[in-house]
Amino acid sequence: MLVMSNPAAVDGTAALYQKINLRLLPFLLVCYLFAYLDRVNVGFAKLQMQGDLGFSDAAYGVGAGIFFIGYVLFEIPSNLMLPRIGARKTFSRILVLWGITSACMLFVRDVPTFYAMRFLLGVFEAGFAPGMIYYLSCWYGPQRMARAIAIVFLAGPIGGIVGGPLSAGLMTALAGHAGLAGWQWMFLVEGLPCLVLGVLAWKLVPDRPADANWLTADEKRLLEQELAVPAAHRHSFGAVARDPKVYVLAFAYFCVIAAIYALSFWLPTLIKAQGVNDTVQLGWYTALPYVGGAIGMLYMGRRSDRKRERRYHAAVPALAGAALLAGSTLADGNLAATIALLTLGTTTLWMTYTVFWAMPSEYIKGPAAAGGIALINTIGLSGGFWGPAIIGWAKSASGSLHPGVLIIAAMPLAAALIILANRLPARH
């Protein structure tokens, strides 16, 4: 990589990335915000639809998680096609199809249709998150990647901050209008904006830096120099798929994702169990853990880039998250302590999440990065099925949320140990 050593070159690079940041990151953040909101708003819908449709906790847990089965089945094909089809067509297709499917969740009538719609939502959203990581790697070098990921994936915590009060407000304010329940309105209102975003993606997302008409020829050359990867460091997808370290990364990610989505889908229920019965109040309480997550992501992404270190910046928060989640089971009956522990636990998990994705993007280079990142994400995202399902099964079997939460607390502990035990130098 060319190292800019004179002040003028450094200033030029800084100005270039300021332009790229403003052009790409806000739009991608908004897109991912709706992706996150549309996959987890079922956690609020549960508060009404479970009674309306007669779901058990186990059925809800499976339905919440089955989204990830559809996602992982179609993720690698989606991402292998992305470099050939282009980001513009890929993101537009994903946004439009998942928006339609999310809005159509209002037609769920029983457990089989619930499972079917959640599965289809996963199929149509497949490839979006790893596709964005690959897309960002086409614009950002290793020294900037963690911060770029932190900004875009800040959409997860923001989705939690906005989604709790928004979903609760829609369910309360619109209940009974036009003969629809509050949860049906919530799915409709939160799904339709994705159609607009799909159209905008077609117009706003350049497939690659060379296609960006808002960059000058000199800026494109400078960016090409910044991102230059020696031919010896480029990999085929087959070589990546045979690399054991890729699967080590994938299992660590599986553990992190299992914990994040177990909390995302069950957080309203966990807080309601502390005696909060007002839906709007519950919405505000569930936003608090995501405020911590947003702050933690920005802080840890920036710190990790500044220190040029990934392993400890990912593992230490995961260790803390395991302890905090386990500790939350000891605070039963104490609303303030429960929210505090869940907030801190959520914060640490999102810290690990944002730093984690800088590791594979530095380890895997060249055209195989799209498939390699998708492979890690595919294996890891299956944790999104098991995490919520484990809490649902444990709740149905024991009558308590605590056993499931304790099992989930072991997940970030395992992730931390895996990350600490494995060093990932740049892959040659």
List where the protein language model places each region.
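Helix-to-loop junctions at the C-terminal end of transmembrane segments
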Residues: 74-86, 296-309
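Extracytoplasmic gate region of multi-pass secondary transporters
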Residues: 42-43, 241-298, 353, 357
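Glycine-rich segments within core transmembrane alpha-helices of 12-TM secondary carriers
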Residues: 147-171, 193-194, 377-387
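Cytoplasmic membrane-interface "Motif A"-like loop-to-helix N-cap segments
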Residues: 83-95, 305-318
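Helix-breaking motifs and short loop linkers at transmembrane-helix boundaries and internal kinks
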Residues: 54, 86, 107-113, 124, ...
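Cytoplasmic helix-loop-helix junction between adjacent transmembrane helices
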Residues: 117-154
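Conserved MFS/SLC helix-loop-helix module at the cytosolic interface between two early adjacent transmembrane helices
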Residues: 73-112
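C-terminal transmembrane helical hairpin of 12-TM major facilitator-type secondary transporters
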Residues: 310-359
